[in-house]
């Protein structure tokens, strides 16, 4: 069964997602899927083997995808970047936690087996979820975004241009923008992660370069492992990575 979920998050923001539950089961595990930047969630296929053994909550954070009708931000990445209190990702990170609240509130969910997964922006959200909320039992990010902004500015064409452009727009030094970004940098969350992690990396990724993936990963002190795909960029071979992820979560079922 698939449900269309609408709920309120931090500062009264409306967010939506899809909640798929296994038929005829109780006390089932659940995985939260965090989406990439602006990516539209797919409707979960309840006929897959994965959906038969665990529930899935696919969530769109504020203003993105399922929530575009509520979008007041314009460009999400740069919105409110002048201050940590107004920056878009302050609210988006709270939406990440709100998704956990929803899953945890479901009576039929095994509260000890809630997992997180996602790629790019969703990979960053996965790591944030694991760092900020010990209700997550294990996480599987791939090609994670939002990590090591000092080097991102040099390595990431789009990110570098956005950061420099915002500094010019605000007529401030780039260091001022990077100071704001430090509050949302995955590097500064990684040390708080206590659950097991598996990470997938595309060695040819120019959007979220491998260097930035590992800058956060290397600071994780909990059990961790990674898989490198030498020929892939910002997308991994789906069947291969999904199998890695499935096998990883199976260890905790």
How should these model regions be labeled?
Residues 17-21, 27-38:
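Short beta-strand element of the alpha/beta-hydrolase
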Residues 203-208, 235:
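Acidic catalytic loop of the alpha/beta-hydrolase fold
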Residues 77-120:
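Gly/Ser-rich "nucleophile elbow"/oxyanion-hole loop immediately N-terminal to the catalytic nucleophile
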Residues 1-25:
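N-terminal cap/lid segment of alpha/beta-hydrolase-fold proteins
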Residues 192-193, 199-201, 205:
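Short beta-strand/loop motif that positions the catalytic acidic residue
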Residues 123, 127-173, 228:
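Hydrolase active-site cap/lid region
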Residues 42-94, 151-160:
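Cap/lid segment of the alpha/beta-hydrolase catalytic domain
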Residues 226-244, 248:
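Histidine-bearing beta->alpha loop at or near hydrolase active sites
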């Amino acid at each position: 069964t698939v449900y269309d979920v609408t709920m309120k998050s931090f500062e009264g923001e409306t967010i939506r997602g899809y909640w798929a539950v296994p038929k005829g089961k109780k006390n089932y595990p659940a995985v939260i899927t965090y989406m990439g930047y602006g990516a539209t969630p797919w409707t979960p296929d309840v006929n897959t083997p994965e959906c038969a053994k665990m529930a899935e909550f696919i969530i769109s954070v504020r203003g993105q995808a399922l929530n575009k009708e509520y979008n007041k931000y314009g460009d999400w990445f740069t919105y409110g970047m002048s201050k940590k209190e107004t920056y878009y990702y302050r609210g988006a990170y709270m939406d990440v936690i709100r998704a956990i609240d929803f899953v945890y509130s479901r009576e039929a969910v095994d509260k000890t087996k809630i997992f997180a997964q996602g790629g790019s922006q969703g990979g960053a959200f996965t790591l944030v979820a694991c760092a900020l909320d010990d209700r997550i039992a294990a996480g599987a990010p791939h090609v994670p975004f939002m990590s090591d902004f000092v080097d991102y500015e040099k390595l990431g064409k789009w990110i570098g241009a956005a950061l420099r452009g915002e500094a010019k727009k605000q007529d401030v030094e780039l260091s001022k923008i990077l100071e704001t970004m430090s509050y949302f940098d995955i590097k500064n969350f990684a040390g708080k992660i206590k659950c097991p992690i598996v990470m997938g990396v595309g060695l040819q990724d120019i959007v979220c370069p491998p260097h930035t993936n590992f800058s956060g990963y290397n600071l994780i002190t909990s059990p961790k492992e990674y898989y490198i795909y030498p020929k892939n960029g910002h997308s991994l071979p789906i069947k291969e990575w999904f199998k890695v992820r499935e096998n990883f979560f199976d260890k905790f079922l």
